[in-house]
Amino acid sequence: MKILHIVKTATGATWVYHQVRVLRSLGFEIVVALPSATAGLAPKYQEAGAAVVPINLDVPTRHPWQIPAVLKSCRTLVQTVRPDIIHTHHVGTTLVVRAALGKSSPIPRVFQVPGTLHLEHPFFAHLDTSLAGPRDHWIAACRWTQRKYHQLGVSPQRVSLSYLGTDLSAFTPTRRNVLRRELGLMPDTPLVGMVCYMYAPKRFLGQTAGLKGHEDFIAAFPIAKKKLPNLHGVMIGGAWNGAIQYENHLRELGHRHCNGYLTFAATRSDIPDVYPDLDLAVVPSHTENIPFAAIEALLSGVPVVTTNVGGIPDLVQEGVSGRLVPPRNPQAIADAIVTSLQNRVEAHRLTLKGQEIARHLFDVERTTREVAQIYTTLISKAA
């Protein structure tokens, strides 16, 4: 069975690479279309045995006059590859495929929905469902998304649930003090971290702050510091997609409000080695599927404070597997930081439960087999 995966980025969406790697081991023929055949994850796709086609099939929002050419390129790609199934992983590429091929295309199409943002805005949610044809299928990556499609009128038979998987073996709770040495911190200094790219506000959606909640993390720190004088914070991850101005804004905000006890670290590739150095991970998202920042922290044995939005409660349940707080609430974040660090035994108990949930839900070997079964079902229906 030949599957065409269409990805909007070569540098992100690591979950797609892990999925493709396992699909290849299961015997599927995989073609991956993404913007570069040499940058980012492209070589790893090729090492996994997938064919890579360099093509950008995201919606050219800044150059709308290029849309006809993008649609034509999409049709040419599909005619050349002749896939049994087309699997898209982002909203933009999904809309391009549907617009290019139309509702009557005989090829089954799968949209594995990685986030909740477009579904929170009626126009984009309607665009998603209205462009779909009878052979379109959705894979929700959290229960919130699954319920939302049902509310939008999509038949439950056309919406599967399968979480975005990761390589569990990459994460261990062994502390190596890599980060603490870099920061010049003692082993017993309370260290709280936020690990996430900096996504600039989407003004066309009315956002005035970044959707990952960096501003809230910065605002919470001085509040928590009053009760935990030795507290130190670190923000790991730089600007996404060239959002340098936004990164500079966050750095200025941090320097102004946190007076040297919040360190900004660049994007780095050794995240599995860094996580165990944290005493607590904070994931203060405003909108979210289930963030890998929370998944990876729990897999590394690190307690998590996160917000009660989107699919996060599938993983982090208040008082069961972590701490849940309302979004956009620095005071609540600060209170949860203090509670977690002052009650280490309880925080450890919650983390063990969170780790158990994460190891089950996000094991890429298991989730990819679910996707493979979805493929088989769709092909049998199309026959």
Residue ranges and their predicted role:
Residues 73, 172-185, 250:
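A short helix/loop element that forms part of the nucleotide-sugar donor recognition site in Leloir-type
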Residues 42-46, 214, 232-260, 346:
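Short, structured helix-loop element that forms part of the nucleotide-activated donor/catalytic region
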Residues 88-94, 113:
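Short His-centered aromatic/hydrophobic patch
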